[in-house]
Amino acid sequence: MRPSACPGLVRVVAAADGGLCRIKLPGGRLDARQARAIAAVAQAHGSGVIEATNRANLQVRGIRAGEAGALTRALLDAGLGPLVDADGDAAALAASDDVRNLMLNPLAGRDPDALVDSAALAAPLLDMLAREPRRFELSPKFAIQLDGGERIAALDHPHDIWLAAWRRGDGAVRIAAGLAGCPPVAAGAAPALVDVAPADTVALVRALLLAFLDLAPADTTRMRALLATCGAHTLLARAQAALPFPLAADPALRDWRRAPSDPALRFGAQPVRDPGRCSVGAQFALGRLDATRLDRLAALADAHGDGTLSMTPWQGVFVHGVATGAAPTVRDALAALGLVVSPGDPLARMVACAGSAGCAKARADTKRDALALAARIGTVRDLHLTGCERHCALPHPAAHTLVAVGPAHYDLYRRDGAAGLGTALARHLTIDEAAARLGEARPSQDPYDA
């Protein structure tokens, strides 16, 4: 088994504010009963603070010493663990939990514009991952994306293996696949490497996983690092040995590009396959909620929806099965709970790591500073506040990044052609100085405003 300090359902890790437990939600989904269970354990065994992650999961913070076991058992009883090994030893349970790193789009199985029902496709994939004998060898960070062609999609979030539905010239829907990246959207993006029939998706993923494990040295835990040494063609050749069908790419895949997704669609009512129903989306301010809010969100899902929720890769949520006429009521209720409900809200594109309140490595209380910045700027900016050089909470550089150098002081970077975060614009800015600089930024510098 590869050692890891990543939090999980069983592996509660120490943080500055107590224990941290990450609850991996299959495709980001949970029902109202499970949401109440998470709220209850956060209150009973932790500080009551809950975070939404950029992989559509939830994590409970501030877990008190000696209470991790009781918290894990309560979450397992609520059906929030893997379907296998729930009664097994801790190592087997942790391994089965770790491999559930499968991200779907928030309207998977509901979007009328999707090419495939990716929620249905995900079920056997998750089952395979949980039962694979070599799952112990995978890093908990190893992640897979399954994109069914939904209108609302996170297409800039790199994964070790990505899968995306596309329609071939003869009308057949296929599953394109690539490694260490994202489905191609821009003209210059790397194309898919192979494509398979939807029914062969599970076999393809398993073959790619086994090829990775066969080829990767013990200290190589992610696909990008392996490809830097052996190349994609070597890995595909190894995967081919585990497949009963030939691996190939349709010639048209070289020019295929996934349709862009409008990030604003994660807010408000969105149509679904069920006539007269919709899903209503909102975003947790800076990814933070608490037990009371989650409990009330569960009540809202029961009262006005079908009792189900989906967390999103933007640290948000969709309430599903809402009658179209009730959408404004649900939106207002989400706003009353403190969620961001409009793409024009200054917090809509702002991300902050846990900060010094939750992480010993952070040099500043990033979430508190982000709220102060949002109030001063008053407009939308694609902005990431990070407490140190690890740049947690965002999988790719934002248009602007503030890196803490001390309490309430930051270096400001602008993403451009320069490596890393981009060009350093200013050093040791106070919150007021940072707000002034960001307020002067041209709208064209922010991809949200482009």
Language model region names:
Residues 1-39, 87-90, 240-299, 340:
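Gly/Thr-rich phosphate-binding loop signature of adenosyl cofactor/nucleotide-binding cores
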Residues 16-17, 183-188, 215-219, 274-278, ...:
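Short acidic (Asp/Glu) and glycine-rich catalytic loops that position anionic groups and cofactors
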Residues 18-172, 194-195, 203, 284-407:
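Small-residue-enriched alpha-helical segments and adjacent helix-cap loops
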Residues 48-52, 86-87, 135-139, 213-238, ...:
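Flexible, glycine/charged-enriched surface loops at secondary-structure junctions
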Residues 102, 177, 280-282, 412:
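Well-ordered beta-strand positions enriched in small/hydrophobic/aromatic, beta-favoring residues
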Residues 128, 211, 238, 242, ...:
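Residues that form generic nucleotide/phosphate-binding pockets
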Residues 138, 142-229, 396, 401-450:
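Mobile "lid/hinge" segments at catalytic clefts and subdomain interfaces of large enzymes
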